[in-house]
Amino acid sequence: MKVVEVKHPLVRHKIGLMREGNISTKRFRELAAEVGSLLTYEATADFETEKVTIDGWNGPVEIEQIKGKKVTVVPILRAGLGMMDGVLEHVPSARISVVGIYRDEETLEPVPYFEKLASDMPSRIALVVDPMLATGGSMISTIDLLKERGCTAIKALVLVAAPEGVAALEKAHPDIELYTASIDDCLNEQGYILPGLGDAGDKIFGTK
């Protein structure tokens, strides 16, 4: 599995700001979208382009456009919605495919409860977004579902990842790509990433 920990200074700075314990909902939400945007820039760097001729202001002009598979953005509810606007800044015409999964706080196992995917998944590149890759369960379940629907080109974008989650994802889906702003130290006994960001969903939405 290709793992990219984005070390751009802007990413390091912004993810550092998100670690503040008493950060406001507004600020956390803004930063989640901003880092999501920067991760998307990195994740789309290998997209192929093709030359086309258009009518310019002074006659025909040759330009480059993205070619190949179209994109679907797949936010994992609910926290993944906090990154979606940042992703769409770069791929505004992408279809949105939504997957609802929550983590059982006792077993730490993923529990799916909703899905609404683009109808043409085999012809799309999926950018799966979720702020946290902790145990990896939610991400693995989402990618399982995408593959069942025929999607073969998948990139996962997360703000913060635990080594345990990275290892679990690589074991389950070695053929995907992972982009993250930080691979943190470890998980605690409750399955939270340390030092992490806390509960990203609560901080993005302002509700527990």
UniProtKB/Swiss-Prot annotation:
Gene3D superfamilies: 3.40.50.2020. GO terms for biological process: UMP salvage; uracil salvage. Keywords: Allosteric enzyme, Glycosyltransferase, GTP-binding, Magnesium, Nucleotide-binding, Transferase. Allosterically activated by GTP. GO terms for molecular function: GTP binding; magnesium ion binding; uracil phosphoribosyltransferase activity. Coiled coil: none annotated. It comes from the Bacteria. It catalyses: UMP + diphosphate = 5-phospho-alpha-D-ribose 1-diphosphate + uracil. Pathway: Pyrimidine metabolism; UMP biosynthesis via salvage pathway; UMP from uracil: step 1/1. Its EC number is 2.4.2.9. Belongs to the UPRTase family. This is Uracil phosphoribosyltransferase. It comes from Shewanella pealeana (strain ATCC 700345 / ANG-SQ1).
